[in-house]
């Protein structure tokens, strides 16, 4: 399977669409019950998705997923790589990691990319999706 994250989606999941009937992505236990669910799949380690009101709204890829963007950037890439490839992205301080951690977010309203950067300057998670879910800091919150 190609492990390439696009603005459209990944692994049969499409931003703005329901999860396909044959998908291995399912909602696990311990959901908050606010109409938002976190989905994962045994076939896609290190990947999770957010579904709100029946639609996939965000897909996130972390270390161990083996997933990259077409540009070759993935978890473990450097903030310099991200800035060079995506110079227009907005930078904000990370909510949890302390100094040096950042979010780099693609401007606009359509499905967009958002990078979480650790204080060591490496990409920890790449998200694709739409606001407000794209900006959620922990799962459905």
List the predicted regions and their residue ranges.
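N-terminal low-complexity, Pro/Thr/Ser-rich intrinsically disordered segments
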Residues: 1-20
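Mature extracytoplasmic domains of secretory-pathway proteins
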Residues: 67-85
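A motif-centric signal for short, conserved binding hotspots located
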Residues: 125
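Mid-length scaffold segments of soluble, non-membrane domains
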Residues: 54-55, 59-62, 71-75
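Ligand-recognition elements built from short beta-strands and adjacent flexible loops
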Residues: 12-13, 68, 88, 134
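Second-shell loop/turn segments in exported
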Residues: 6-12, 66-73
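A cross-family detector of function-defining hotspots
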Residues: 18-52, 79-122
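Short, low-complexity, Pro/Ser/Thr/Gly-rich segments in the mature regions of secreted, periplasmic
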Residues: 128-141
